[in-house]
Every structure is written in structure tokens, then in C-alpha cells.
Swiss-Prot record:
Belongs to the Casparian strip membrane proteins (CASP) family. Keywords: Cell membrane, Glycoprotein, Membrane, Transmembrane, Transmembrane helix. Homodimer and heterodimers. It is a multi-pass membrane protein. This is CASP-like protein 2U3.
Length: 191
């Protein structure tokens, strides 16, 4: 007979909370930095795009003449607000001495919001990029002439804003991946 005589085998002692929280704290730090990048880049997207204006003789090109550019600015403003709020909350949790992993409900809310905003920003950036392509190359089917040779400053600023918006998409997508990790790494018993 064994030393336990049919009794349940002893369970391994749980690892220390400090060791368990180290990867989560490291991910929280990465999330904090990614959200800061999203905040800064969203500010730049908005600032550069709203200054995308140019007048040549009697003609003018302005960012708010296009619904795609207006949508990009609006989505960037929403992402800016959300990312700033998440940055503040992440910084608070990181600096807190009694730091705990977020609840499953909170993890779901973060995951869903991160997914929605990442895809919204991707869609707005893609629509703006398509408009910029047409502005640069024209469209023979629609008989639209390219305008970037005339409105070079406008096109350069709009293009810079679009490139920045794709950088924001990358930061948001990585934040979303971290949110997914926080949500789906949990055992099914923790609620």
C-alpha cells in the first residue's frame, strides 16, 4: 500500500502571486505603452488631417470635403478618447500596490471595445487610403482627373495622416491582442 492509502494525492502548492502577476504586469506595461502610442498617433492623425487644406487660384481642396476624411478624423477622435481612458486605467492598475488581474466581465468589455475600435479605425483608414489613391491617380471609369499634381500640399498632408492612421491601427490591434490574452487565458472557473 502506498503512503496515502487511497486518500487523494496532495496538490501542488499554488505558485506565489508575485510570480503569477509578473507576466500580467509586463503585459499591462506593454498595453500601457501601446495605448500611449495610440493616443499620440491619434492626435497626430487629427492634427495633420485638419490642416490638409490648399487653395490654388479659385479652386480649393479641404479635408472636410470628403466623408472618408471626416470619418477618419471622427474615428481617430473616438480612439483617442478611448485609448486615453484605457491608458489612465492601466497606469492606475500598474502603479497600484494591490494590483489584481481584471475580472472576466471587465476583460470581455475591454476585448469587445478594442475589437470594435480597431476594426473601425482600419475601415476608416482604408476608406481614406482609397480616396487618396483616386486623388493621386484619378479614375478613368468615373472620368475623374488626378488632383495631387495641382494640390500637392493637400495630398501630402492627407497621405501623412493616412500613414499615421495605419500606425494607430497597429497599436490598437496589438492592444486588442493583449486584451484577448487577458480574456482567454483565464480558466473557465474564474468569473
Amino acid at each position: 500500500m502506498g503512503a496515502y492509502d487511497g486518500a487523494e494525492a496532495p496538490r501542488a502548492a499554488p505558485a506565489s502571486t508575485a510570480a503569477n502577476s509578473r507576466p500580467s504586469r509586463l503585459l499591462l506595461l506593454h498595453s500601457l505603452l501601446l495605448r500611449l502610442v495610440a493616443v499620440v498617433v491619434s492626435i497626430l492623425v487629427i492634427a495633420v488631417m485638419v490642416h490638409a487644406k490648399q487653395r490654388v487660384m479659385i479652386f480649393k481642396a479641404e479635408w472636410d470635403n470628403s466623408k472618408a476624411f471626416v470619418a477618419l478624423v471622427a474615428i481617430s477622435a473616438i480612439c483617442l478618447g478611448y485609448s486615453f481612458l484605457q491608458f489612465i486605467l492601466s497606469a492606475f492598475h500598474l502603479c497600484s500596490k494591490s494590483w489584481k488581474s481584471p475580472t472576466k466581465c471587465w476583460a470581455w468589455m475591454n476585448f469587445i471595445a478594442d475589437q470594435i475600435l480597431t476594426y473601425a479605425m482600419l475601415g476608416a483608414a482604408a476608406a481614406a487610403a482609397e480616396l487618396a489613391y483616386i486623388a493621386k491617380n484619378g479614375s478613368s471609369r468615373a472620368q475623374w482627373q488626378p488632383i495631387c499634381s495641382t494640390f500637392n500640399t493637400f495630398c501630402t498632408r492627407a497621405g501623412a495622416s493616412i500613414i499615421l492612421s495605419f500606425i494607430a491601427v497597429l497599436a490598437l490591434a496589438n492592444s486588442s491582442a493583449i486584451s484577448a490574452y487577458h480574456l482567454f487565458r483565464r480558466p473557465s472557473s474564474s468569473v
